[in-house]
């Protein structure tokens, strides 16, 4: 199989969008600013919150979906033993070493995962998937060609995973899907939500004609309208639910109407899958060949994301 440059690019793009979120870290987490003796940090402007909210709707679903795709690609070609060894070196050791480094910067060891939490959860998915992949029935289910009806059912499930995550996390408040802080702070709802996208990536590996269909101009136009409508409804829902919040940094301590929270969660689920499919289609249409620039971007995106936090905070502090 030739290298899929469209998916390489999209995975790297999703990872690098984390820099756009973390660029405002001093405003989102005042405790970080306090460590640099910066007090009275104002809350982020609304446009900053809008950018963070928009990117957060699709970034991690896209990342885990493509991780599932590339996982089964390697597993199918190289075998389980090679696959697990490779992922332990590339993902698990990177997570452990760099998370440890970031953890001890404040002088204490709290077993926090920092911004590398997704590597920790991805390694859990990889180990679990490697085990269940040995089951013949599971292999047959995920490797079958899916009909439009089955694909529609999968989409519905992915939409439901967001409100389901709220329920599983026993948390009918806004930031129920916030990442875990430590290795021991895993949230069942988050795992179900992200693992569902991981499995979707596996299914797409066996149904790669879907990429061509999503790249068709008429499908892209339809998806773009659906995405815009979905996000407009999400903005309106968020305004109804959280419009009275004066400082979003204290949102975890506030209570909201459970019905509005669940509606907002459904809309987030719709946005997650719609934007994910749209971005796959757009990448498939625009990125069709290799180039030196693309290789550079793909190769550097992972190490840049792993180490970017400290340089970014230092630069933010200097220009604060």
Name the predicted role of every residue range.
Residues 1-320:
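Alpha-helical transmembrane segments and their immediate juxtamembrane cytosolic regions
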């Amino acid at each position: 199989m030739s290298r899929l440059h469209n998916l390489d690019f999209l995975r790297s793009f999703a990872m690098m969008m984390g820099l756009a979120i973390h660029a405002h870290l001093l405003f989102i987490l005042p405790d970080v600013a306090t460590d640099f003796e910066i007090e009275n940090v104002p809350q982020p402007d609304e446009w900053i919150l809008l950018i963070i909210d928009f990117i957060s709707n699709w970034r991690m679903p896209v990342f885990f979906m493509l991780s599932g795709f590339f996982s089964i690609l390697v597993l199918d070609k190289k075998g389980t033993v090679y696959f697990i060894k490779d992922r332990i070196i590339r993902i698990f050791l990177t997570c452990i070493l760099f998370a440890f480094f970031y953890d001890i910067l404040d002088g204490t060891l709290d077993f926090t995962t920092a911004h590398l939490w997704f590597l920790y959860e991805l390694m859990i998915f990889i180990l679990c998937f490697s085990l269940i992949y040995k089951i013949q029935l599971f292999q047959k289910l995920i490797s079958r060609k899916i009909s439009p009806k089955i694909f529609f059912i999968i989409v519905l499930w992915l939409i439901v995973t967001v409100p389901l995550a709220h329920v599983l996390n026993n948390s009918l408040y806004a930031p129920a899907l916030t990442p875990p802080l430590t290795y021991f702070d895993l949230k069942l709802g988050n795992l179900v939500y992200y693992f569902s996208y991981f499995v979707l990536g596996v299914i797409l590996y066996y149904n790669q004609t879907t990429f061509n269909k999503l790249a068709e101009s008429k499908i892209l136009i339809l998806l773009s309208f659906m995405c815009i409508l979905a996000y407009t409804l999400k903005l309106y829902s968020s305004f109804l639910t959280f419009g009275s919040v004066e400082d979003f940094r204290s949102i975890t301590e506030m209570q909201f109407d459970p019905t509005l929270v669940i509606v907002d969660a459904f809309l987030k689920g719709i946005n997650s899958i719609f934007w994910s499919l749209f971005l796959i289609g757009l990448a498939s249409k625009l990125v069709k060949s290799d180039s030196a620039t693309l290789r550079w971007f793909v190769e550097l995106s992972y190490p840049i994301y792993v180490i970017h936090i400290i340089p970014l905070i230092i630069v933010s502090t200097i220009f604060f």
